[in-house]
Amino acid sequence: MYRPAARIFVVVLAALMAAPLCAQNHPRTDALPPIGSVTPVEVPSPEQVFAIPPAMRAMLQAQVIDRSSSREQRLQALVEMIFGRQGLDLQYDANATYTVDEVWQQRRANCLAFTLMFVALAREAGIQARVQEVGQVVSWYQDQDAGVVYSVGHVNAGVEIAGRYATVDLDRNVLYDRHGPQPVSRARALAHFYNNRGAERMAEGDLVGARAFFDASVVQDRAFPSVWNNLGVLDNREGNTDAARQALDRALRLDGRQDAALTNASALYRQLGLDAQAKALERRLKSVQREDPFAQYMLGTQAEQAGKLAEAIRYYRQAVRLYDTAHQFHFGLARAYFLAGQLKRADRELLRAQALGGAPQQARYQAKLDSLARWRAQQQARR
């Protein structure tokens, strides 16, 4: 069974824990805006993405660097500067894929923008910091109208203090895959930035802007599977099915287990009437998902929402078997058991979820089940 390595989170970040992950909640894309409303394409250079504005550098000097020569104390001071009211007073915004300068101006950031800013400021303060990539979390979103999956990815920051390593993430409850956060190059970090911006533009219907950012992502890292998936979606949306097929094929050559590319490629083959190829990809997708605890959990959630509790229980149990230390999975199973009237099993899974989640999760999970109990009693009273 997979047991993730311990992660260190800066306690001050707890103020943002109610915010979602970097999964993006973009506007509907069923109707493209008129050409005249499309924002001109201004792709910031790599230097502009990381550039610290003078006023922010002055704040860093006063609130972090001048306060202590200790790297550990500077790290804590940096977090206080970023989230404190006397500093940036940073707010979470899932759609704020900003440069460091834009974060300074807007005082908002998503996971990616926060990470790039944090690493830039930490290095300026003499703290060893790096951008880290998490291969699999809930880092893609579904456009229900268009029926496609966009890849955006998840990143966080890693720091080293006196030989100890810590991860700084906007969500301390984020569930990482088997590999956990992996350090990435500056080029890959920039590829994430441009890819995110491109996904945002595409969701807004600005296909010209989307392509400009996706192209910039490819320039930084041609081996980044997510951007090829997104280029495939964009090419298909523009009616260039040959280019879409090439882009999606390239995404799958780079990562043959990527759900988004498998989903989009199989849909494209169906669209082209290539049913045999589509079926082959669908079989591969199902095979990947059977051994993927994240996919099993999401399938369980979908089944639960559809009222298919036996199916939901089956998916949740598989997720737990594959990743037995994830308190979220145990709570999903507890919830499904409870709704199905299997109360003893629900209690068992709830206790497991509370034990794994620790004190912060215990009251929250109990409150959720208490709410479900009231709802269930109301439903039974109406019968």
Segments the model singles out, each with a brief description of its role:
Residues 39-103:
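Secondary-structure boundary elements
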Residues 91-228, 233, 237, 242-256, ...:
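Long, contiguous interaction/recruitment modules in multidomain scaffold/adaptor proteins
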Residues 191, 225-226, 259-260, 293-294, ...:
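Helix-start (N-cap) detector for alpha-helical repeat units in TPR-like alpha-solenoids
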Residues 196, 230, 264, 298, ...:
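Canonical tetratricopeptide repeat
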Residues 220, 254, 287-288, 321-323, ...:
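Structural marker of alpha-solenoid helical repeat scaffolds
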